[in-house]
């Protein structure tokens, strides 16, 4: 195949490129805003980075020309900064000294009044005994109180060995008792131990049995 002239090849190549760019034109138009935004963001970031580098260089230059002084605030004092005159001095503990003085005063006052208290002890004890005898003649004559009257044990209590029953055991046996037996147990409980849980249990059982 014969080679075409140079001018023809140039025109054909230009036409081909024009056709390809024309075919890419819709895609280029759609991507152009995104490309423009990314380029703008890149330019802004480069600008900020340049400003930061300039500031850092300025700080370094200022520190070189004007070195900072080691300043320490007045309130920042440490143990090693205190003068040597304070070494060896002791601070009196006011609370401990006051407490020791108060204890010494209490001991002295106890020692002073101990003689009077010892001398007055026999008289006060005899006076108190005579006063007790005069105010309580019945207790002196009858030191022992009268014993409580014995409560008769109902038959149902003796049958169940009621005094030895626990609350759970009594609850388990309530369904086998009728109303008179429950009332007898309640009266016996009130007259003897008067335990609130037992009284409540018996009273509730009597109420339910009566309602039936």
UniProtKB/Swiss-Prot annotation:
Assigned GO CC terms: cytosol; peptidoglycan-based cell wall; plasma membrane
Domain of life: Bacteria
Region listing for Disordered, in residue ranges: 97-151
Transmembrane intervals: none
Signal peptide: none
Protein name: Uncharacterized protein Rv1109c
Biased composition annotated in UniProt, kind: Basic and acidic residues: 100-111
InterPro entries, alphabetized: LipDrop-assoc
């Amino acid at each position: 195949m014969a080679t075409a002239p140079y001018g023809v090849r140039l025109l054909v190549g230009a036409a081909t490129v024009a056709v390809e760019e024309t075919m890419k034109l819709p895609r280029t138009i759609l991507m152009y805003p995104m490309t423009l935004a990314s380029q703008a963001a890149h330019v802004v970031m480069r600008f900020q980075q340049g400003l930061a580098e300039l500031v850092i260089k300025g700080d370094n230059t200022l520190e070189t020309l004007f070195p900072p002084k080691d300043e320490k605030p007045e309130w920042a004092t440490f143990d090693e900064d205190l003068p040597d005159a304070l070494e060896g001095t002791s601070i009196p503990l006011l609370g401990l000294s006051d407490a020791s003085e108060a204890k010494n005063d209490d001991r002295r006052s106890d020692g002073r009044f101990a003689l009077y208290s010892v001398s007055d002890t026999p008289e006060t004890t005899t006076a108190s005994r005579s006063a007790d005898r005069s105010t309580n003649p019945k207790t002196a004559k009858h030191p022992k109180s009268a014993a409580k009257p014995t409560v008769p044990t109902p038959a149902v209590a003796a049958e169940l060995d009621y005094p030895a029953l626990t609350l759970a055991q009594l609850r388990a046996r309530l369904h086998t008792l009728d109303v008179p037996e429950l009332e007898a147990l309640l009266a016996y409980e009130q007259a003897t131990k008067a335990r609130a849980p037992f009284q409540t249990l018996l009273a509730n059982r009597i109420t339910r049995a009566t309602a039936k």
